[in-house]
């Protein structure tokens, strides 16, 4: 029988687990429930995907958004894993085919929205098959204290209880205060769970706050975006009107930008999201409807054009930068107008006819105001931004991180800020105590020859991805390509030693990359 380490290497291409991952995997395999709080980019999905491939039955992953399911399943299929998703983006015929195949044992991992668990057809399927594990992703959605409360998450427990044999349950989230963790544990009725918080820190992320009047924000944004060159980025706005205006502003300057918000036609949203994932668009301008669970690893910057409603939302959205561990920037533009806009939405939610009792809505509004207060403190503090956030999530941190605007740029003018920010990005890759030596190496500077090789590998990846009709990062991540440049493998055995290269991907793409490397650097013999 395979063990977790062999699955990790053969399927996902990693030599070792990251901190906290192996303990979670082994607890789930032993049948113990898990509650794990891990920052975006820390590898939550590995924690349930590895045991899913080792457990005898099917794993059901409850996920809140179609985009997350599509990303995760696409990446799994590229790695050779039998996975599928079931949601309303499929036609009725596609849903029926997927369920029939699931009954026939085609899949080891199935992603569903929480509402799907209540549907008779899916319930009948789950009664017939062995469900070994139920994974609750974005588990903070179960809590009214959480920033993304979804009432349908409260019914996950009923589904678990209805199964003939109770599966092991794993709950995962990137951001959860102590109160939210209490709600997750209680509402899912986890059985003596193994609880772990691997730490919220993302050392490769640089944080910055800038106060800017609404009239100043367009210029600030353009300056920031133009300095990023061709890097992929996300710009978050608080309203759909602001999204449309900001996307048009960037487009008017020749920047490949697209908009994403709930008022757009579903087909337009899908096209714009795919354009971003497939690198046809450089920048996505979006409300927070975009990105929960988006797994695009090479987002190099996230700019919040408006202050978010709370630190949970901010850290989750900012955390979509640098998921591959390479240096990336998270910048917040804020003004007093932002606070008034958020309060308007809080009041609107209070007035909404959503069937909730008045006292429940009043309590939700009070909690929202409390979270907004901390968000405002973060935006205006002169102390270390990283420490402020980590302390908010209950984690100790040094007085100064050395990689945020408050630490690095106090009393400096804007030009000095940008110069030192560039230097800080380089230091983050080389010196971060959380990044391994290997990951630090692939984030460093390259020689002119290596830059040409990297460009050739990017071009090859783009061609191969187009043939497979998948986003380029699903072939190999930027970090994996940079390690290829550093290591210059010339044999399949050497290629399989590259982080992120599993057996299926090596079989599918290995010879093409080996030929490209040999063409550029020649034989070492």
Residue positions per predicted region:
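Accessory DNA-binding and partner-docking regions appended to nucleic-acid-acting proteins
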Residues: 1-4, 340-341, 346-361, 367-373, ...
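Short alpha-helical "packing" element that flanks the helix-turn-helix/winged-helix DNA-binding module
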Residues: 21-24, 375, 481
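Conserved catalytic helix of short-chain dehydrogenase/reductases
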Residues: 67
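Short alpha-helical segment immediately N-terminal to, or the first helix within
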Residues: 27, 304, 378, 483-484
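Helicase motor core with emphasis on the C-terminal RecA-like subdomain
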Residues: 2-11, 15-19, 23-45, 52-55, ...
């Amino acid at each position: 029988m395979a063990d977790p380490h062999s699955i990790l290497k053969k399927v996902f291409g990693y030599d070792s687990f990251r901190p906290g991952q192996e303990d979670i995997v082994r607890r789930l395999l032993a049948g113990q429930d898990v509650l794990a709080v891990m920052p975006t980019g820390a590898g939550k999905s590995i924690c349930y995907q590895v045991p899913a491939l080792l457990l005898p039955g099917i794993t059901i992953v409850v996920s809140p958004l179609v985009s997350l399911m599509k990303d995760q399943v696409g990446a799994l299929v590229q790695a050779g894993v039998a996975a599928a998703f079931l949601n309303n983006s499929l036609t009725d015929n596609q849903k029926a085919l997927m369920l029939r195949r699931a009954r026939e044992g085609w899949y080891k991992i199935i992603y569903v929205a929480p509402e799907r668990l209540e549907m008779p057809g899916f319930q009948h399927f789950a009664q017939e098959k062995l469900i070994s594990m139920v994974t609750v992703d974005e588990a903070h959605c179960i809590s009214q204290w959480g920033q993304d409360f979804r009432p349908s998450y409260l019914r996950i427990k009923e589904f678990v209880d209805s199964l003939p044999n109770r599966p092991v349950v794993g709950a995962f989230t990137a951001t959860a205060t102590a109160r939210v963790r209490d709600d997750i544990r209680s509402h899912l009725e986890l059985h003596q769970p193994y609880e772990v918080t691997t730490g919220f820190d993302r050392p490769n992320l640089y944080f910055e706050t800038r106060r800017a009047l609404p009239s100043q924000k367009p210029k600030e944004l353009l300056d920031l975006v133009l300095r990023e060159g061709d890097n992929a980025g996300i710009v978050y706005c608080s309203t759909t009107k602001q999204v449309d205006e900001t996307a048009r502003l960037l487009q008017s300057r020749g920047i490949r930008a697209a908009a994403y918000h709930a008022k757009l036609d579903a087909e337009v949203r899908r096209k714009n999201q795919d354009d971003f994932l497939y690198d046809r668009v450089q920048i996505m301008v979006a409300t927070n409807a975009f990105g929960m669970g988006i797994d695009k690893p090479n987002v190099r910057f996230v700019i919040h054009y408006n202050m978010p409603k709370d630190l949970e939302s901010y850290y989750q959205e900012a955390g979509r930068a640098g998921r591959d561990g390479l240096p990336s920037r998270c910048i917040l533009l804020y003004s007093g107008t932002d606070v008034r806009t958020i309060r308007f939405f809080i009041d609107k939610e209070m007035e909404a006819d959503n069937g909730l009792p008045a006292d429940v809505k009043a309590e939700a509004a009070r909690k929202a105001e409390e979270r907004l207060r901390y968000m405002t403190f973060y935006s205006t503090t002169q102390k270390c931004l990283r420490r402020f956030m980590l302390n908010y999530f209950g984690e100790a941190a040094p007085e100064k991180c050395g990689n945020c605007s408050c630490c690095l740029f106090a009393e400096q003018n804007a030009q000095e800020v940008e110069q030192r920010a560039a230097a800080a990005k380089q230091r983050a890759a080389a010196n971060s105590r959380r990044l391994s030596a290997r990951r630090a190496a692939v984030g460093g500077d390259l020689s002119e020859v290596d830059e040409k090789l990297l460009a050739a590998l990017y071009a090859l990846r783009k061609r191969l991805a187009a043939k497979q009709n998948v986003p380029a990062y699903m072939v190999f991540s930027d970090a994996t390509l940079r390690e290829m440049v550093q290591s210059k493998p010339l044999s399949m055995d050497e290629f399989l030693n590259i982080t992120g290269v599993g057996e299926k991907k090596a079989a599918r793409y290995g010879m093409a990359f080996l030929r490209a490397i040999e063409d550029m650097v020649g034989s070492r013999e």
